[in-house]
Amino acid sequence: MEAHQFIKAPGITTAIEQAALAAANSALANAVVVRPFLSRVQTEILINLMQPRQLVFRPEVLWNHPIQRVIHNELEQYCRARAGRCLEVGAHPRSINDNPNVLHRCFLRPVGRDVQRWYSAPTRGPAANCRRSALRGLPPVDRTYCFDGFSRCAFAAETGVALYSLHDLWPADVAEAMARHGMTRLYAALHLPPEVLLPPGTYHTTSYLLIHDGNRAVVTYEGDTSAGYNHDVSILRAWIRTTKIVGDHPLVIERVRAIGCHFVLLLTAAPEPSPMPYVPYPRSTEVYVRSIFGPGGSPSLFPSACSTKSTFHAVPVHIWDXLMLFGATLXDQAFCCSRLMTYLRGISYKVTVGALVANEGWNASEDALTAVITAAYLTICHQRYLRTQAISKGMRRLEVEHAQKFITRLYSWLFEKSGRDYIPGRQLQFYAQCRRWLSAGFHLXPRXLVFDESVPCRCRTFLKKVAGKFCCFMRWLGQECTCFLEPAEGLVGDQGHDNEAYEGSEVDPAEPAHLDVSGTYAVHGHQLEALYRALNVPHDIAARASRLTATVELVASPDRLECRTVLGNKTFRTTVVDGAHLEANGPEEYVLSFDASRQSMGAGSHSLTYELTPAGLQVKISSNGLDCTATFPPGGAPSAAPGEVAAFCSALYRYNRFTQRHSLTGGLWLHPEGLLGIFPPFSPGHIWESANPFCGEGTLYTRTWSTSGFSSDFSPPEAAAPASAAAPGLPYPTPPVSDIWVLPPPSEESHVDAASVPSVPEPAGLTSPIVLTPPPPPPPVRKPATSPPPRTRRLLYTYPDGAKVYAGSLXESDCDWLVNASNPGHRPGGGLCHAFYQRFPEAFYSTEFIMREGLAAYTLTPRPIIHAVAPDYRVEQNPKRLEAAYRETCSRRGTAAYPLLGSGIYQVPVSLSFDAWERNHRPGDELYLTEPAAAWFEANKPAQPALTITEDTARTANLALEIDAATEVGRACAGCTISPGIVHYQFTAGVPGSGKSRSIQQGDVDVVVVPTRELRNSWRRRGFAAFTPHTAARVTIGRRVVIDEAPSLPPHLLLLHMQRASSVHLLGDPNQIPAIDFEHAGLVPAIRPELAPTSWWHVTHRCPADVCELIRGAYPKIQTTSRVLRSLFWNEPAIGQKLVFTQAAKAANPGAITVHEAQGATFTETTIIATADARGLIQSSRAHAIVALTRHTEKCVILDAPGLLREVGISDVIVNNFFLAGGEVGHHRPSVIPRGNPDQNLGTLQAFPPSCQISAYHQLAEELGHRPAPVAAVLPPCPELEQGLLYMPQELTVSDSVLVFELTDIVHCRMAAPSQRKAVLSTLVGRYGRRTKLYEAAHSDVRESLARFIPTIGPVRATTCELYELVEAMVEKGQDGSAVLELDLCNRDVSRITFFQKDCNKFTTGETIAHGKVGQGISAWSKTFCALFGPWFRAIEKEILALLPPNIFYGDAYEESVFAAAVSGAGSCMVFENDFSEFDSTQNNFSLGLECVVMEECGMPQWLIRLYHLVRSAWILQAPKESLKGFWKKHSGEPGTLLWNTVWNMAIIAHCYEFRDFRVAAFKGDDSVVLCSDYRQXRNAAALIAGCGLKLKVDYRPIGLYAGVVVAPGLGTLPDVVRFAGRLSEKNWGPGPERAEQLRLAVCDFLRGLTNVAQVCVDVVSRVYGVSPGLVHNLIGMLQTIADGKAHFTENIKPVLDLTNSIIQRVE
């Protein structure tokens, strides 16, 4: 069907009409939808106010303030679209959930009418939290809102929106509030009626009524059911008049939108506000006429809002203009007051002629009429007087001028002014008027009002300047200035007039002088309990922290704070500076914002301010929306117990590490001083000064903690040599030799006892060891180091993180810690544990253990040792315990030397212990293997892939380097060469946003090479030494190099850096844009290396879910942690970073970057702009589209005007059509019915051995009477075309033979040739060209009968669950959704129905050739309509299944065992079968109407029902070369074929038959079965059967057939072996082995159903078909032969019998 054939546009005759039609269509397409019900007057008012915008009225809601709310919604849409992610001032509670783009909302505590608004606010979503806080007076639960008001809130936001919420704030206050927020733009919607400029009174206008009592103005619009606006008059006047704010917070106020007297003001922070004069009311329709007597009292007995009448009256402009024109042009004899009154009465009547308004009229009060008559009469009198006097005096003047002589004229010419200063008439000075005189006029026209007022902000700068000037003036007079204007106390220049450096200065204004906060303060944990709750710290940690105290030494310097926190026996240092990076336990980054002048700091959702008070340092903390205030007294705090401190630090570290492992977002890493410091929870620049290398800093799990070597104050058993200097360029010096304690040989055991701290100072000739944290503690005394014994260890492998594997003795390690293979009790044992005890017996004193981590114990006596406990594999194999044994040794600073834990006495396999160490160690650790373990490692050590650089590759690469070196960009490559050889590398590949770059740590790399400047800047911001490929040629020699986006680097530069580096780690995505040959010299593809990823990362932290699904073809294993489900939007306004594909598009879009430049970058929002010149690029390189789609984290707008991305399968049409059809986001139960394989409880199938295929089919042919057919198919005569219009090709040549690959030459199905052109014509005409018998009747009776099976259906909603099932089905079929188009019925592809012939013929026990019936076809609807109707039909089907009685079975939506049990329970019943002939072809307008009735019951949108009726009632079937235009019928390829065929089948059976002892019924399409004891035809059946032309064939027998199974009451359902074997005989098992394998698997599935019922099936199936049981037995054996893959095939070439003669079309 092509719906466009029923849509016809009217003819357009001229270009003017065409332009007018285009303009009208455009106006309607962009019209404002008005949803409320409106009166006629309200409609006229709204049309006039909204001009020139087109309005579309779709009334569906009742509003209290319809006119204002429509205007409000329009202005709100404009403001939110321009503001983007912003802060909102005074949001309406009902708008909170609808606008997730708002960062923060400022509210005031509700009073009066606001309380009612909060009570009616939504109780779900973000609004619920706000509602709870507002009504219960609770503090905010997060940072997304506050109740401090706009003026007192300090949430940082660049853009703001205020919708009718600034009427109580002066412009100067708003300027200061914006400065406090750091806001540069604020979109404010305000209602500013011009009547507030007038004196108090009651003003009636055409739109609203305004009551002005001098202080407040109340505005009520036409039709309002409750009070309208009520605002302060003086503030409204200020907003009308002000165009700029000057002072410390300058603003420019611009009116960017206006609807009536509703304005959108754009307040922009500008350093020098320029003049911005504006006319606020250029379209005002009223003139305000002043009453000459002024206002009088109100005669009412009841109090009113305004007790006086108006001074001014609003008069329509057309009334006043018409009255002035009439009165000013009357003759002197005709002019009088009564004539004016008569004329005014006439023009005040509204006159309409048909639909044309000839006179608009005016409905005025008596006061207004009196004032207008008086003002008009006096104004005209004054004008007449001027006219008379001007003519009279002018004539006299002319007489004087004409009477002048030559001398007088010469004098006038010489001495009187002329030229530019001459204005005719000025020299006469007829009449001088004053502003307050009556002659100055009686009316005010708002159209002519112009405002440009500047207001100073309310800061004290102006007063300070005045004070300075006044004091200087007094001092100049020699007086002592002691006036009230002297500087306020506590300000710089507090010395008053004596400070000449400040007084009178305009350059250095007075600033608040903050007192020096340096000093020592005591911190008690119980003061910060509110903060611990805000941080969601576990209760045990909070309880421990509350019991502890700390002493903090604070040193303040300009823009810097140094803190030294002493907690028990531990000391921590932090440095607070602006821009410091805070450590985190998740992927988020936190940068500290510190302002010393404001004494504040903040990061993320945490902020604090501090102030020195007499009681101490007062700190106000805001964390996660909750506030905490603490005052830390000066002086020291009592020292905490070391055990308590150690337990607190240990628990805090475990909490941080647990959060880091399991949280997707994480938060601040909470150091001990972050919970017990004066600036919690911040601890920037955390450095530990303690002597205990405890608490796990720098472990494998903490990316941000110190990874330097550990320094301690314990005394070594041996003296050490002088410390070595730190390596240049490294953040921390490496541990010197003097700080390394080794296991002494047994001969030196006597020195172990001397491990006490000496008290003598260090000799002057020795260099003290390097200490990492200033100020350094006093170093211990070191003795001169003796020469170490020769080492015999052998290096086996080095990991990229610096960890090493050695073969040798643990005693040769230089690591800070030694790991002992201990037992759970940490008692001296055997093996390595015994060796440790011999050398370090003190290490086993449990009282000296400083920390326990799990089963591991840490000690510093006599040196750092960790006792680790591995599982005993002799008792139980416990891999988790083995992992934990290594993991528990990582809670330390410095490096550690390990043995293979458990591989000795505990008999843990070497491979398992090694793998556990490999997964749980820290950078720089060492593993020592015994010789047997080393042999295992040599055979299994990890190998890095190798890249072989051949001589040809090196020669070509060097040529490319020479070409590069000659350019300006590549001059750094001069002299660089690549030599042949082998390069080992590590290549981490991953999906976009998988964190490849973030996984690199600064300690792992020296140089980072990146392809673009954008990436270089990103790496440098993270603190890495990053270079572009050419510049990096100078710095990569011998360095550890990481190459980001390696596949996109020029290959010659990639090879150069890989060969020069000491170790190379490649990062990238092989599916993204490869290196581009900009020179087009052909060198790039010639030398591009084949890089093999060593690891693939499949989890993306950037890409939303919809992007992952789009790119899943390139990344089959991609997963995402993003919570954004839908991020791609089409044809919306551009946002964020613009991405283009070509340089031409980049030049046309300022600020855009190409996708090649964007590789590796991450943006919150992006806009992809596809231009026509990128068609070849996108079609040839899908990588460009992948890069563009994977750059954003939240939202991406696609502007695809040429449709390039749609051509590669990137479109949102499916989702748009789904929501257009009324779909909703929600969940239904899935439609998949869980099915399991039958258990072999009987296994009777095993009694049937495989049998001969040929004999089984011969026996089947004998039993059914079928013989070998001489032909492959029969083309029956084509029936007469009874209705519709057939389009057929001129050429109808057909092939006369068919090649088939089959099991037997005897076919047991009807013979047809689906691929023949004449067969297609016969099916088209015979099935869909037959006359449809229409039946006009009500559907109520049939629907009532259908209720026996399907009760009345309630409202149904199509949800995203059904949409997902639709998409899942499309994906399973290999479809990408590109065939789903926008719902445009003028497009033929949207509504096309494609027809093709079925290739499966029907099994029959009768004659296979002489049936003379046409074939069967499939009419596939377009994918657009399938996606449009499919979710609705699936949702309706689910609802029907939920309502069906348990004994009614629908389609395949049931478990087979349940149906079998129901049949088994009906042992005394007979089987009622009904067979329809031409079921689809006989469906007509009545069946279609019944479908529409059911759809209406389900709440389907009416337009969707009408569209379905249109598509079903008139259609065009499009075959490959033929097409048929027809009406009605049913098409088997519709999205609701099974649903509506089954419903129609149920309706016919329920309406036409009545059953006795009804037990079970099953319906599937046109197939049905009912188990009952008797049946009869209903009394209303004949009318329906005859009216619809139904062809029913009823069979009533003990055993029946239904949907491929045999229904045997009392036994159950059994597979139909005869039918299945007969259909196999017709199948073509060729031409390739794939088809044969598919059919073999189908046979296996069928046999699985025979597992337990094979013997019963032999007896029952043979009775149904009247064949011998032996046949069924042989057929089962034959199927087992086929399932075993031993089938025998015959290849036959058979002719096709053509019985067609001509196509006969009936002439109407």
Swiss-Prot record:
ATP binds at G990, V991, P992, G993, S994, G995, K996, S997. Residues 975-1219 are annotated as: NTPase/helicase. Residues 1222-1708 are annotated as: RNA-directed RNA polymerase. Residues 1098-1231 form the (+)RNA virus helicase C-terminal domain. Belongs to the hepevirus non-structural polyprotein family. Keywords: ATP-binding, Disulfide bond, Helicase, Host cytoplasm, Hydrolase, Magnesium, Metal-binding, Methyltransferase, Nucleotide-binding, Nucleotidyltransferase, Protease, RNA-binding, RNA-directed RNA polymerase, Thiol protease, Transferase, Viral RNA replication, Zinc. This is Non-structural polyprotein pORF1. The protease domain interacts with host EIF2AK4 (via C-terminus); this interaction inhibits dimerization of EIF2AK4 and prevents EIF2AK4-mediated phosphorylation of host EIF2A. It comes from Hepatitis E virus genotype 3 (isolate Human/United States/US2). Residues 442-509 are annotated as: Putative protease. Residues 714-793 are annotated as: Hinge. Residues 949-1097 form the (+)RNA virus helicase ATP-binding domain. Its cofactor is Mg(2+). ORF1 polyprotein does not seem to be processed into distinct enzymatic domains by a viral protease belonging to ORF1, but could be processed by a host serine protease like thrombin. Residues 1469-1580 form the RdRp catalytic domain. It is found in: Host cytoplasm; Host cytoplasm, Host perinuclear region. GO terms for molecular function: ATP binding; cysteine-type peptidase activity; helicase activity; metal ion binding; mRNA methyltransferase activity; RNA binding; RNA-directed RNA polymerase activity. Residues 772-790 have a biased composition (Pro residues). Residues 747-792 are annotated as: Disordered. Residues 56-240 form the Alphavirus-like MT domain. Residues 800-957 are annotated as: X-domain. For methyltransferase activity. The keyword Heme does not apply. Gene3D superfamilies: Leucine Aminopeptidase, subunit E, domain 1, P-loop containing nucleotide triphosphate hydrolases. Methyltransferase: Displays a capping enzyme activity. This function is necessary since all viral RNAs are synthesized in the cytoplasm, and host capping enzymes are restricted to the nucleus. The enzymatic reaction involves a covalent link between 7-methyl-GMP and the methyltransferase, whereas eukaryotic capping enzymes form a covalent complex only with GMP. Methyltransferase catalyzes transfer of a methyl group from S-adenosylmethionine to GTP and GDP to yield m(7)GTP or m(7)GDP. GDP is a better substrate than GTP. Y-domain: Indispensable for virus replication.
